[in-house]
Amino acid sequence: MSDSAAETRPALTPPALTDDDILQRFLRTKNQPTGSQTLGFRLLSVSQENRSVEVAFEARAEVLLNPMKQIQGGYLCAMLDECMSVACMVASGMTHVAPTVEMKTSFFRRGMPGALRGVGRVVKWG
């Protein structure tokens, strides 16, 4: 990779927005995507330095449960995807969106309705 290519990478660009600016943008938005609304998405904290976000979800029983009264796995994957995509946006200083090309998930416990917390962190950019 040339030096000029490295300089244009979003993760190396000095942030134009503060962490609080980004958080306030998310909290003030009136056009939250329908999927985010369905999942009960709420951004709790942002760290551009750590390339991470903390997110809350409210898993409503009347919407997200399977016949076993547990959160359907596809909804849990969507929650994870939200954490990943918002972390990528934050890592880029809100200049890039990273679509999910591939995602592998292993479930170790069932998800139950109510409040859930997720953390997204960019480990490697590019």
Question: Which positions does each model-derived feature cover?
Answer:
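Terminal targeting signals and extreme-terminal segments of soluble enzymes
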Residues: 1-126
